[in-house]
């Protein structure tokens, strides 16, 4: 097993002085020999061994067989022995594809004139607010782990116009589900001088189109190994939040229980609806209610009870939240006051708007969720290298 995949070696008794019976599974070895074509071998060739040298021996038996095509273990056991489980070629392939997604995000945004930034993950205040914060002591001062780079992204629009970041974010949500992590990687961007939130949706569509071509070109081996069929991203339909609720209620005879947010079952049905109606794998749901969006979300001038924002659903799972932001200083202050919030701790953020900000917007994409849907996995922990959830702090 090498970085490139499996390598088939042929040992002939008597050709070398090495006793093959002494070789333990998972030992690290160095070999020399003659390379020969063999269509039945992985990658179409094999090595006829002349010498074998053991670089390091395995000190004990593996907790499970990593040479199997699929690991013969539960997800919990997999995660308990993560560094070993990831040596399996299929497990490893998942994260090669995830690498391709991040690479596509970076490459595409660089080509669109974005600047990569790196923002703090410890702060005095969170952009999203609320109770779902990891709190800590920072040299005898209260601090939090950031839920989002939102404030920093917006401030940097006033500097670079277009910025992006790939980094961890932290959510102290006590959800023990197949779709939630308490630490995950967020693919964020923010762009200035937009005409509307549709520009943000178009930029994400471009990223997805670019990335699917990249995966098809450079990660074909991993896609084939995992049996992945890449999604259709030629066109992504969009539907208003209230219309989406009505459509699935009528078609699937479902009562609307929460008029202000989408329940997971509704998201799944919206995905099903657009797959059945137009063969779409993705759908943008736009104009979420203002009361369910943060204070910096731009309200719809035509109906301020809704916002110029969106979520992107992939096979019925939310993978993106984004939209247009408020760029007017007084409008921001009015929204903060209307919500009964305080500006304490937001002085630096508001200062950027006090001194002029362009119309702008952005989004955040959950990398692990996107990868989970790409690979058709059923649990987001399958696509997190070392997942952190409500029960797991190790490894």
Stretches found by the model and what they are:
Residues 1-194:
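Class II aminoacyl-tRNA synthetase-like tRNA-binding/catalytic domains
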Residues 62-71, 181-182, 204-206, 299-302, ...:
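Short intrinsically disordered coil segments
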Residues 72, 79, 83, 102, ...:
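Alpha-helix initiation and N-capping motif
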Residues 93-97, 227-233, 320:
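Extended, non-catalytic structural segments that build the interaction scaffolds
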Residues 127-128, 206-315, 338-351, 355-356:
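Metal-assisted phosphate- and nucleotidyl-transfer catalytic regions
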Residues 192-200, 205, 245:
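Extended, domain-scale alpha-helical bundle/helix-rich regions
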């Amino acid at each position: 097993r090498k970085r490139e995949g499996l390598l088939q070696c042929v040992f002939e008794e008597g050709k070398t002085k090495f006793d093959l019976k002494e070789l333990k599974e998972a030992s690290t070895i160095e070999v020399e020999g003659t390379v020969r074509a063999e269509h039945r071998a992985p990658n179409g060739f094999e090595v006829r061994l002349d010498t074998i040298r053991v670089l390091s021996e395995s000190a004990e038996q593996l907790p499970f067989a990593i040479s199997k095509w699929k690991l013969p273990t539960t997800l919990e056991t997999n995660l308990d022995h993560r560094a070993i489980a990831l040596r399996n070629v299929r497990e490893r392939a998942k994260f090669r594809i995830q690498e391709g997604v991040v690479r596509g995000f970076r490459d595409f945004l660089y080509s669109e004139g974005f600047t990569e930034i790196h923002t703090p993950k410890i702060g005095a205040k969170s952009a999203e607010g609320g109770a779902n914060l990891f709190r800590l002591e920072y040299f005898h001062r209260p601090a939090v782990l950031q839920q989002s780079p939102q404030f920093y992204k917006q401030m940097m629009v006033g500097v670079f116009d277009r910025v992006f970041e790939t980094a961890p974010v932290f959510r102290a949500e006590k959800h023990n589900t197949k779709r939630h992590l308490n630490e995950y990687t967020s693919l964020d961007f923010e762009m200035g001088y937009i005409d509307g939130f549709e520009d943000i949706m178009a930029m994400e569509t471009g990223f997805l189109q670019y990335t699917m071509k990249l995966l098809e070109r450079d990660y074909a081996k991993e896609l084939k190994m995992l049996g992945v069929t890449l999604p259709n991203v030629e066109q992504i339909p969009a539907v208003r939040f209230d219309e989406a609720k009505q459509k699935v209620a009528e078609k699937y005879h479902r009562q609307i229980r929460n008029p202000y947010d989408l329940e997971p079952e509704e998201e799944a049905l919206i995905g099903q609806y657009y797959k059945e109606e137009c063969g779409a794998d993705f759908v943008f749901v736009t104009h979420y209610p203002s009361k369910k969006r943060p204070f910096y979300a731009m309200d719809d001038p035509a109906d301020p009870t809704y916002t110029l924002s969106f979520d992107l659903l992939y096979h019925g799972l939310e993978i993106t939240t984004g939209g247009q932001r408020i760029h007017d200083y007084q409008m921001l202050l009015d929204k903060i006051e209307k919500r009964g919030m305080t500006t304490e701790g937001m002085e630096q953020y508001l200062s950027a708007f006090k001194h002029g900000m362009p119309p702008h917007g952005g989004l955040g994409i959950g990398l692990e969720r996107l990868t989970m849907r790409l690979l058709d996995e059923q649990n987001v922990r399958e696509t997190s290298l070392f997942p952190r959830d409500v029960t797991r702090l190790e490894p």
